[in-house]
Amino acid sequence: MEKVLSSHVGMKINEWYYHIQRFNVPDAEAYKEEIKSLLDDMEENQDLLLYFSLMEFRHKIMLDYLNPLENGKERANIRELAMKIKKDQEKLTGLLDFYFNFFYGMYEFENYEYLNAITFYKRAEKKLSLVSDDIERAEFNYKMAEIYYHMKQNHMSMHHIAQAIECYREKETYTVREIQCSFVIGSITT
């Protein structure tokens, strides 16, 4: 049987992430399953396997965000996956290092560990220049604004939310995120 090109799987992971960013659960689930089936037949590529693990982690964060479990419980394997990825962190470079720190910051934020979250976000910020996607940069700024808001650092929050909303306004498909940015601004100014 012929091996699946890792570049093909990488493109599929990018498409999966596109749907994760838009909170499009049905399509994200479909891509995840398709990619899992391709991984078994893929040529060996450790970086791509790490990328898959990071996106799987982000996928689970999305699901927890959309459907939080009661009393602070989390999905059984999200913590295990987080620990597995954290163990492999020293292998991450460049954009993968950005994603690790950004996603782990989200994870810590969702667990109300704000100081840990800001530490991971700051590490991600050092790699932000490697991110070419405007929406990804906007999402980073939105998350920074969100955490600074929770830490009562309104000037920093306003700085980041202004950058995020500017990008979201330019994209027709991000109206919901633009509205969420407006909520943050409204919360800061009242």
What are these regions (language model features)?
Residues E33-D40, A76-E90, I118, K122-D133, ...:
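Amphipathic alpha-helical segments of tetratricopeptide repeats
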Residues I147-T190:
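Loop-centered beta-sheet repeat module
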